[in-house]
């Protein structure tokens, strides 16, 4: 039988996990979105928008925000949950491993979605996603390291 103190301790632990998850995900999603915005106003973005049929910059930015938050929540959850099982000692490196793993999954699913143009989409999409995923992973790892640093 659980005591009330054990129940409160689990509740506190769950609340602490949720707070950390939210902070990491918001930071990572914001880094993803800022990187996407900077790329969207660059000259190379015109070819990318044409290839993926993005007609409106605001719509593309909203989609990037939603996608970045989903990826950031996923990476943050797995980093918090499985930090000790991931290779390496540095949390930034561990977050980058998770981020690039997510990118590989996304790229495979994108290629399966349109097999006729899979190679073109794979090259363009991977090239455009590397800076976004790099920013997301580095930021999540950095914030995680800051949260858990012993002073």
Task: Please report, for each region that a protein language model flagged, where it lies by residue.
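Juxtamembrane/disordered regions of integral membrane proteins
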Residues: 2-151
């Amino acid at each position: 039988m659980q005591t009330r103190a054990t129940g409160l301790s689990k509740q506190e632990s769950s609340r602490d996990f949720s707070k950390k998850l939210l902070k990491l995900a918001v930071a990572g999603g914001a880094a993803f979105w800022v990187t996407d915005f900077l790329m969207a106003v660059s000259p190379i973005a015109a070819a990318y928008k044409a290839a993926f049929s993005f007609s409106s910059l605001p719509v593309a930015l909203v989609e990037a925000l939603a996608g970045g938050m989903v990826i950031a929540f996923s990476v943050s959850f797995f980093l918090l949950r499985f930090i000790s099982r991931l290779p390496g000692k540095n949390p930034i490196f561990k977050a980058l491993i998770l981020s690039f793993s997510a990118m590989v999954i996304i790229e495979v699913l994108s290629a399966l979605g349109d097999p006729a143009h899979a190679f073109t989409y794979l090259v363009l999409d991977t090239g455009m996603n590397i800076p976004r995923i790099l920013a997301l992973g580095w930021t999540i790892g950095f914030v995680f390291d800051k949260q858990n640093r012993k002073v």
